[in-house]
Regions:
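Residues forming the flavin
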Residues: 1-174
Length: 174
């Protein structure tokens, strides 16, 4: 796990080595790819404070909808009895544009669960998952809308990330 980057200020801030958690320093020739994963806010704050050039990027924000699996099966298979014993749990996908902005379902989990996914205390963040048999009585899907950097006031390059974090905390409080 990376603990810090060593930058060469004479070369325009290029990464010349990476310090890992146990204190070892690894020197690199060529580009360094940071595969941060989800909720790596500390990494982005570190890079920003180190003077790395960054720009704000859009995200998708929404809610997770939960439905009886039978209802989705009935709608998708056009059958009052649902899927029967031979068809798989039904899925759906919703995609549209509203005034040029994407609105869509995300990570539809047939016969699945809504699960907690917060990475910090006092946050509400959820995701969905389906067991391999997709056999629970509930299905769920994220329903999200595109949020663009220009939707959020200010010039802070990390403003979209800060908006996301504040939204997760607001959901906890309310």
């Amino acid at each position: 796990k990376m603990s810090s980057l060593v930058l060469d200020s004479d070369e325009g801030g290029w990464v010349v080595s990476v310090v890992i958690v146990n204190g070892l320093q690894k020197t690199f020739r060529g580009p360094v790819v940071l595969a941060t994963g989800h909720s790596a806010r500390d990494v982005y704050c570190y890079l920003f404070s180190a003077g790395i050039d960054m720009e704000a990027k859009g995200i998708a924000v929404g809610v997770r909808l939960e439905h009886p699996s039978l209802l989705i099966d009935q709608i998708q298979y056009h059958n009052k009895q649902g899927r029967g014993k031979y068809l798989p749990a039904a899925e759906y996908s919703f995609v549209t544009q509203v005034e040029g902005r994407g609105v869509y379902s995300f990570c539809m989990c047939p016969g699945g669960f809504v699960i907690p996914a917060a990475t910090d205390k006092e946050q509400i963040v959820v995701n969905g998952m389906s067991p391999c048999n997709r056999g629970t009585q509930w299905s769920n899907s994220g329903m999200v809308v595109e949020i663009r950097p220009e939707d959020i006031n200010g010039e802070d390059v990390l403003k979209v990330m800060r908006f996301q974090e504040q939204t997760e905390r607001d959901c906890w409080i309310n």
